């Protein structure tokens, strides 16, 4: 039995979330009656309302009076008044991943998983399949700049989705093709141990049907080890590793973009193809690797090399992934979602490779538990920044943990040899600090998953208002 064509109103609790909003938009485009609520009137809520969906700001039992079905994410607490009202009425309550899985049954699906790089890789796969006239449906964990949204309804056979591993629900997704970019210790609050995370990724690959395949980055030692434990499924490896089936070669990161070539060597004897003069208008070797994963999938699905080359060169990027927010006095300000030490290190390395001048990092640590569990890594991931400005921790609903806060991180950076780590008392002071520090040609990179994105977009105007 498939998802019925006709359902009563489908109510999304937390419809403004990046994952929920994408599913809601696709279901609306399929002709379902979609409504939803969110705690705040954010950009996603406004976008969905403009598309004709009924939205509520705030959670209230009255919001589900007309609903026939309720969709929730794991972020919604059991005492949410709308969830309680739905259960009192015995309405079906569906988890976000379960609803995404239902949508995926309509199509052949590419699912992108990994601790880092999922959103950019999902966007790149969608872009390359689009260039090959495959017209994919897309549900992403970030706003794709070319679409102006994180979701797109296509008429083709394929669907491209970001597979969120944070709560383990990615194991519900019926993927035909899977990408694994990397596997690092993250979301330990859910999994309990790194071994449990690695086991979840193994099961994710094992779930692929016999006619599908997995694309896996063997530059990452944990992923390479996982490849050795996968049996009876087709694996295509990628990376700079000389043993990769799809090998990234001659990466040049100068000028704020990535130039490279890729060699494809199938396990079939004698098959070899090279794609040269590839340009991605994003800096960073991590982004060149993401592009290589997308290229591997596109090539396997029949997209021509010239179409791949043109699509990569025209890639418009993803919101909050090394996004330029403006300039001041010759210095460029960027906004980036990076909030894990591996992500921060990769972004700052990309910044360092893209400018011959200084790099100033502004970081808002996200969650006390993450800072605690990865503290040593946080203290050593800022080496490519000349100056690190540390804001107070964005709690995301958590209680403070003694010894793991802004001042602890500043002290940890200094004790491990960083020459210029300093604390930010209040966001209002940031413009003054940057005005004193930044010189023409410098990059100012704002990092974090909290409210720092608002600071990054406000900073150019605030600096201009101060004069030069």
Curated annotation (Swiss-Prot):
GO BP, sorted A to Z: cell division; cell wall organization; peptidoglycan biosynthetic process; regulation of cell shape
GO cellular component, one term: cytoplasm
Keyword Acetylation: no
Catalyzed reaction equations: UDP-N-acetyl-alpha-D-muramate + L-alanine + ATP = UDP-N-acetyl-alpha-D-muramoyl-L-alanine + ADP + phosphate + H(+)
Record pathway: Cell wall biogenesis; peptidoglycan biosynthesis
Gene Ontology MF terms in the entry: ATP binding; UDP-N-acetylmuramate-L-alanine ligase activity
HAMAP family per record: MurC
Family to which the UniProt record says this protein belongs: Belongs to the MurCDEF family.
Full protein name: UDP-N-acetylmuramate--L-alanine ligase
Organism per entry: Methylobacterium radiotolerans (strain ATCC 27329 / DSM 1819 / JCM 2831 / NBRC 15690 / NCIMB 10815 / 0-1)
Gene this protein is translated from: murC
């Amino acid at each position: 039995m498939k998802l019925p064509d006709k359902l009563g109103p489908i109510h999304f609790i937390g419809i403004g979330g990046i994952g929920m909003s994408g599913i809601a938009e696709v279901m609306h485009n399929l002709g379902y009656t979609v409504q939803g609520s969110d705690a705040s009137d954010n950009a996603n809520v406004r976008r969905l309302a403009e598309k004709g969906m009924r939205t509520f700001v705030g959670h209230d039992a009255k919001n589900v009076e007309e609903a026939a079905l309720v969709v929730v994410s794991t972020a919604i607490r059991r005492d949410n008044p709308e969830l309680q009202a739905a259960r009192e009425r015995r309405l079906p309550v569906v988890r976000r991943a379960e609803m995404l899985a239902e949508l995926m049954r309509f199509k052949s699906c590419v699912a992108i998983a990994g601790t880092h790089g999922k959103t950019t890789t999902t966007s790149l796969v969608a872009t390359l399949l689009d260039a090959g006239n495959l017209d994919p449906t897309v549900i992403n964990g970030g706003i794709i700049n070319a679409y102006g949204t994180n979701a797109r309804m296509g008429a083709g056979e394929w669907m491209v989705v970001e597979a969120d591993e944070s709560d383990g629900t990615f194991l519900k997704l019926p993927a035909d093709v899977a990408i694994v970019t990397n596997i690092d210790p993250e979301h330990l609050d859910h999994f309990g141990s790194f071994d449990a995370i690695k086991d979840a990724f193994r099961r994710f690959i094992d779930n692929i049907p016999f006619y599908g395949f997995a694309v896996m980055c063997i530059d990452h030692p944990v992923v390479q080890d996982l490849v050795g434990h996968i049996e009876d499924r087709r694996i295509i490896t990628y990376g700079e590793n000389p043993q990769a089936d799809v090998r990234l070669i001659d990466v040049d990161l100068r000028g704020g973009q990535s130039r490279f070539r890729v060699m494809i060597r199938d396990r079939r004897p004698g098959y070899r193809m090279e794609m040269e003069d590839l340009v991605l208008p994003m800096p960073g070797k991590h982004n060149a690797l993401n592009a290589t994963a997308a290229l591997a999938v596109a090539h396997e699905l029949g997209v021509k090399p010239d179409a791949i080359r043109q699509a990569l060169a025209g890639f418009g990027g993803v919101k909050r992934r090394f996004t330029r927010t403006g300039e001041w006095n010759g210095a460029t300000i960027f906004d980036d979602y990076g909030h894990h030490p591996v992500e921060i290190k990769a972004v700052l390395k990309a910044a360092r490779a893209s400018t011959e001048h200084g790099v100033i990092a502004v970081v808002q640590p996200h969650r006390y538990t993450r800072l605690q569990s990865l503290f040593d890594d946080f203290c050593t991931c800022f080496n490519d920044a000349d100056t690190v400005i540390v804001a107070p921790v964005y709690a995301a609903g958590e209680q403070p943990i003694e010894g793991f806060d802004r001042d602890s991180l500043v002290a940890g950076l200094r004790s491990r040899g960083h020459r210029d780590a300093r604390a930010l008392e209040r966001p209002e002071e940031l413009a003054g600090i940057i005005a004193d520090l930044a010189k023409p040609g410098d990059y100012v990179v704002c990092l974090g998953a909290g409210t720092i994105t608002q600071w990054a977009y406000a900073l150019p105007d605030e600096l201009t208002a101060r004069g030069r």
